[in-house]
Swiss-Prot record:
Organism of provenance: Pseudomonas savastanoi pv. phaseolicola (strain 1448A / Race 6) (Pseudomonas syringae pv. phaseolicola (strain 1448A / Race 6))
Any one Pfam family match given in the protein's UniProt record, by short name: CxxCxxCC
Name of the molecule in the record: UPF0260 protein PSPPH_1551
Record family assignment: Belongs to the UPF0260 family.
Signal sequence residues: none
Amino acid sequence: MAAKVEPFWIRKTLDQLSTEEWESLCDGCGLCCLQKLEDEEDNSVYYTRIACKLLDLTTCQCSDYANRRASVPDCIQLTPGQADEFKWLPPTCGYRLVSEGKDLPLWHHLVCGDRTAVHHERISQSGRMLSENSVAEDDWEDYLIFRAG
């Protein structure tokens, strides 16, 4: 009987992951690409339904991932070295879960084999977002959906 081999996200640290393994932790929810507002009083971060101009509102994929920083200079590129800063990511985020030593959820494509499960389970905001090009920044506060952390 062969020994069970744990999945890479369980048996490796973030620093041990290959580039392909690291990128595959992304569940494709697109929540990290939503505009966020910070409460000046307590520094809480709130997610809005307002998506980055490059985010496809249905697939939740960046329309120009390779060149995104040229169009969106403040686009955050997640790296394993930032794991201690991942608290702002949603609690369902693969990067955050693995950085906290937790397993991936059953709907994650690495577990179930279906990249659309994140949408079927309504983890993503697919079909429920607005492009930042269509909402004045002064109105973003009207579109808060949840508090980070």
